[in-house]
Regions:
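Activation on beta-sandwich/Ig-like modules and their edge loops
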Residues: 3-213
């Protein structure tokens, strides 16, 4: 993986995206999580830190009509850690856990992680029949945007980019001014077609850590 980090001090120290199997051999993705670590000698505050998931997968090459990648990331999902400034302290060398679903997954899959004590969970309001679970004992992240129409999952093939950012404008301003339709030419054998990926641009100057898997 490729890693980018600034001097802010928060880093993505672990991304668990693996697809597990139930005892019946069925795929299980709900035990995914991300660990964010304070990589400094001082207490830092994770309030308003935004977790980003890339709009496109990194295993496919896209020839964009207008290439934004030299100065921005196109995010397909954005989830902010809630807080007013000093509500989420993270001591030096300590970590917080963002869970896809904040429950004990060892009850459902062998060796599944216990995420019932995660600091935050991703919760989506689905627009189709696949409905997310809201665990009452784990606070929800503030969902700004998610590319999935059902529930957010991390790609089990490990072909996405994940990042942490500080967004210096209000949610309303960001959602209005930074929405972006990225067009590219899709080619397969003799077929060519202009495709569009919808997302939100995040300037590189706002990103404090990123992992390109």
């Amino acid at each position: 993986p490729e890693v980018y980090n600034t001097a802010e001090g928060f880093v993505i120290s672990e991304v668990f995206f693996t697809q597990m199997l139930t005892t019946e051999g069925k795929p299980y993705l709900y035990g995914q999580y991300v660990i964010i670590t304070n990589n400094t000698d001082n207490t830092l505050y994770a309030d308003s830190l935004v977790f980003l998931q890339s709009a496109n997968i990194s295993s496919l090459k896209h020839d964009y009509t207008k290439d934004f990648r030299t100065n921005s990331m196109l995010a397909g999902s954005l989830f902010m850690i809630p807080g007013k400034g000093k509500d989420v302290p993270v001591a030096a060398g300590k970590s917080i856990v963002l869970a896809l679903n904040g429950k004990d997954h060892s009850k459902f899959v062998p060796h599944g992680p216990d995420l019932s004590k995660a600091n935050f969970e991703i919760y989506d309001i689905s627009t189709n029949r696949v409905v997310d679970e809201d665990q009452p004992n784990v606070p929800n992240l503030d969902r700004w945007f998610a590319k999935s129409a059902s529930i957010t999952v991390l790609h089990s093939g490990g072909v996405e980019t994940y990042a942490l950012a500080r967004i210096p404008v209000s949610k309303e301003t960001y959602m209005k001014d930074y929405q972006y339709d990225a067009t590219y030419l899709f080619k397969f054998n003799t077929t060519e077609k202009v495709m569009t990926t919808k997302g939100y641009l995040v300037p590189n100057s706002w990103i404090i850590d990123a992992v390109n898997l």
